[in-house]
Amino acid sequence: YDKAVMIGTVPALVALGWRWKPARLMMASIAVLSLLSIQIYQGDLARADSAFFLKYFLSSQSAILWMSALFVLATIFYWIGLLARSESGSAIGQKLTWVAVLMGFTGLMVRWYESYLIGADVGHIPVSNLYEVFVLFSLITALLYLYYEGHYGTRSLGAFVLLVISAAVGFLMWYSVARDAQQIQPLVPALQSWWMKIHVPANFIGYGSFALSAMVSVAYLMKERGVLADRLPTLEVLDDVMYKSIAVGFAFFTIATILGALWAAEAWGGYWSWDPKETWALIVWLNYAAWLHMRLMKGLRGA
């Protein structure tokens, strides 16, 4: 299943690199750092505590710690850029965000390899628990933001979007300390399914898009009320970013919900059981469906 997932992602990555040039260097860098980590490990997980580059930079835990620190620093510099009208501050925030994404994805790839070093029966794609999906959420939200930043040519929204990412990595660090959540654990039987490998990433593309649109809507409301109005993009640009983010998120969330129902039918014998998670997924879906309907049919605009 893992090999099939990796092969299946190749066309998507090729398409991404074709349409978005910065992603090409990012993907190549992730591949180089991941392969370097595998080479340094030499098939021995204990080297994570003895090999210098693994211990301080490239083991999954170290890379994710770097990701977290860099996201927080990026948030600070984006706010400096916004409040002080400093282009250099925002530019530093942008570069730090790119490096954070690089370290985060490298950490996930290395964590995938580390799980197989523990045991072939333990190895799994790292999207199986709260620790791993919070890393994934942070990375997807950051990547989506970087795409829109480049597309619209403005860095002023980084101060808002990076706030929610910093909150996520703050929770991630607390969760690691309080629950020792960074430790790789075997999958419970219900998660030993290939559905997990496509359901979870699709879900978190949706969550990341919704989070981004929520923070852009905060900027929209501030602009509308004259707060930092001269430092933010036009209302039309903010509205367009919100709409596109919600549309992308809704599409992926719909796909993920359908995949989740199919997974539930295979694991528990029923497509829908009205448990709290499923019920709230439906509420979220209906909420965004109503918003998109009002926009497309009634011309609704704004936050």
What are these regions (language model features)?
Residues 1-50, 59-184, 191, 198-228, ...:
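Hydrophobic cores of alpha-helical transmembrane segments in multi-pass integral membrane proteins
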Residues 232:
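P-loop NTPase nucleotide-binding/switch module
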